[in-house]
């Protein structure tokens, strides 16, 4: 358990560094497809980098000790009946496990509520083969995998614009992106970078969908006005793509922004040296030594110590395994 937590801790640091690099250099570019790809690659990259072993050379130290071959060779094995685990490590690991269980429970409950809502609506299939769910509730339109959920009012008044927008999410498989981001958050729920990455990924999804709508001939001003009107709607499901997603100002700004120069794509090559530099973060001995202490914590020992009412101090028993002495024959 301790080793897994250290692995997740390293992955969270790598993700934070890589996301910081993205937000500084790439987030303002209009290469939506590249930005989406870059954000998605940060997730597996952050989990792969901790698997790469990096060690720094520690200078050897020599002491003025005289080695005597004639001295007896004594070997010891340290036998600990129970390793002593600091209470701080126990608390951190316990909180981490509770956080994972809470996130899983919340995620499952959200899916159950979403499925109930979809079942309660009227099912339609449009001419393009899109699966529509029309409900009586006044909620913001959203898409989830192959389904578009829309209220009756929006279906009657703004059907074309909304369906074009949500169909872009479906065609570009944005729901799978959010699933990957949620899996990352489930393991790194304590990491702000994981939450920021998902929010940025949702924003890029909206950029792509907005751009698709405008490419279909929808008037930009009318479409922006519709976004403003629908920005006051309620949204209930954080695992879906919403028509009135937050950061409306950024979306409108991106619609009006001049396309980035093609030379700006060279910025994406910076991810290679940045990834290599992040590997060296945990190569320092003082950091690796502390992490090794946490890695040595076993889940069985952890649960035993949490469940026990008494946590007594351990006593190290040193067992003498073998003693070899030079032997001589004595003459009488």
List the predicted regions and their residue ranges.
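Membrane-embedded and juxtamembrane structural elements of multi-pass membrane proteins
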Residues: 2-287
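Short extracytoplasmic/periplasmic juxtamembrane "stem" segments immediately C-terminal to an N-terminal membrane anchor
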Residues: 68-73, 296-309
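Ser/Thr/Pro/Gly-rich low-complexity linker/stalk segments immediately outside membranes or between
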Residues: 289-296
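Non-cytosolic, low-complexity segments of secreted and membrane proteins
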Residues: 307-317
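Single conserved hydrophobic/aromatic residue that forms the stacking wall/gate
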Residues: 319-332
